[in-house]
């Protein structure tokens, strides 16, 4: 019996551990700044006024377009969702079976325990009702800015960017991460682009410390609101 209780306790601990949200770790290599590759110096052409690799177009702007360049993304995300669902199932059934004769004779027989005659009539009835209601409402707002680096320039000119920002506060750390694809035409003259213009965006806002822990339910609350709760 003790071994069985130990197995149940261990299984419950494992299930509760699976309900805990993973804590983001700093210095993720995926979000590390991508540095530009250093090209080999072009061979100097003695006697030439114009040297290869030192040219600059008169119409070139200062917007990021190479690997390792920096872009500032302004965060302006607002999402809201609401869902209501209701269901009701009801079933009633009833049946009566009556025999007027059995092999040509009346089915009533004398009751040996007294009272009226015994009858071969039978019947049943049943009712079943199932009802459920659910409602979910969620809203999120994220504003601010984060400066990221160009990780890759695709053949069609689309720029892949990613980066993160960690802020150490008195009670913990705050994390903002973003990765996605940006069109060069969407980059403003001040080298900024709104987050609503980032395609395939992966935005993470999380943190560690006492404030982050206070917003998480306890281990017993997570058990009661988990799908494992039978009621």
From Swiss-Prot:
User: What are the lipidation residues for S-diacylglycerol cysteine?
Assistant: 19
Gene Ontology annotations for the cellular component aspect, listed alphabetically: bacterial-type flagellum basal body, distal rod, L ring; cell outer membrane
Q: Does the keyword Lyase apply?
A: no
GO MF terms here are:
cytoskeletal motor activity
Q: Name one GO biological process term.
A: bacterial-type flagellum-dependent cell motility
The UniProt keyword set, sorted, is:
Bacterial flagellum, Cell outer membrane, Lipoprotein, Membrane, Palmitate, Signal
The record's subcellular location field reads: Cell outer membrane; Bacterial flagellum basal body
Fetch the InterPro entries from UniProt: Flag_Lring
Signal peptide location in the record?
1-18
Question: Pfam families under this entry?
Answer: FlgH
- The source's domain of life comes to Bacteria
- Please indicate if the UniProt record lists Isomerase as a keyword: no
Q: What does the record say about its membrane topology?
A: Lipid-anchor
Lipidation positions, renumbered (N-palmitoyl cysteine)? 19
Q: Which HAMAP family match?
A: FlgH
Q: Which PANTHER family match?
A: FLAGELLAR L-RING PROTEIN
On subunit structure and binding partners, the annotation says:
The basal body constitutes a major portion of the flagellar organelle and consists of four rings (L,P,S, and M) mounted on a central rod.
Give a short account of what the protein does: Assembles around the rod to form the L-ring and probably protects the motor/basal body from shearing forces during rotation.
Q: Which family would the database say this protein is a member of?
A: Belongs to the FlgH family.
Name of the protein this chain belongs to = Flagellar L-ring protein
